[in-house]
Amino acid sequence: MLEITLLGTGSPIPDPDRAGPSTLVRAGAQAFLVDCGRGVLQRAAAVGVGAAGLSAVLLTHLHGDVLITSWVTNFAADPAPLPIIGPPGTAEVVEATLKAFGHDIGYRIAHHADLTTPPPIEVHEYTAGPAWDRDGVTIRVAPTDHRPVTPTIGFRIESDGASVVLAGDTVPCDSLDQLAAGADALVHTVIRKDIVTQIPQQRVKDICDYHSSVQEAAATANRAGVGTLVMTHYVPAIGPGQEEQWRALAATEFSGRIEVGNDLHRVEVHPRR
């Protein structure tokens, strides 16, 4: 069984009720933080997960809204290196983040006798193929389409016969269909293009170019034959009592289980027999 927790269901648009985009996937004793938008460390703390409890951080792309909480560490005296898996460019972003916190790191090393080095991090960059295989949990990567943001990737996590695919920001594409084929669950970002296109600001309308609508995400789930569609990264934010509107739109393209939730919404994923 895999457990999905929507830590942050928001978008780059500030929302007092939604943290930035991030999803926690638990696979047995392992836990993976997929993207890490603003406020996600607080959301992770709410479900009892700290930096020391993470097996790895997985980044689908390098847009700022999924990187705001990229400073993930703990106060252990000798922590194991934290793996960060992302597309090419991830190492540069991590290096820049460590540099930005250089003064803070120096202050803490000077203050605490048991801290002698910056936090250990292992960066692994992928565009496709296997990315993880430990203790019965595997992760596979495939390219997605969020151009002009490139490269971008999605992740397929498998454990004990259950599988979940995390698409990140993307428009429909063959590589995502292939990655998600037969998965038990697909976590997909969604926007309401019918609403966004009515906003009289071109920069806002532009986001329709490289995100999937609710119906497009649902059609991807249908083509891939997944069991459950989990929607997240809602643009605009879902208001109270509006969840059924979004679910109904998805249901026009996908007849399986559809999950729409606020931050901290949990979904259990079991292998389909």
From Swiss-Prot:
Its EC number is 3.1.26.11. Zn(2+) 1 binds at H61, H63, H146, D169. The keyword ATP-binding does not apply. The keyword Nuclease applies. Zn(2+) 2 binds at D169, H233. InterPro entries: AtsA-like_MBL-fold, Metallo-B-lactamas, RibonucZ/Hydroxyglut_hydro, RNase_Z/BN. Keywords: Endonuclease, Hydrolase, Metal-binding, Nuclease, tRNA processing, Zinc. It holds the Pfam family Lactamase_B_2. It is an enzyme of class 3 (hydrolase). Its cofactor is Zn(2+). It catalyses: Endonucleolytic cleavage of RNA, removing extra 3' nucleotides from tRNA precursor, generating 3' termini of tRNAs. A 3'-hydroxy group is left at the tRNA terminus and a 5'-phosphoryl group is left at the trailer molecule. SMART domains: Lactamase_B (SM00849). Binds 2 Zn(2+) ions. One of its GO terms (molecular function) is metal ion binding. Belongs to the RNase Z family. Homodimer. Zinc phosphodiesterase, which displays some tRNA 3'-processing endonuclease activity. Probably involved in tRNA maturation, by removing a 3'-trailer from precursor tRNA. This is Ribonuclease Z.
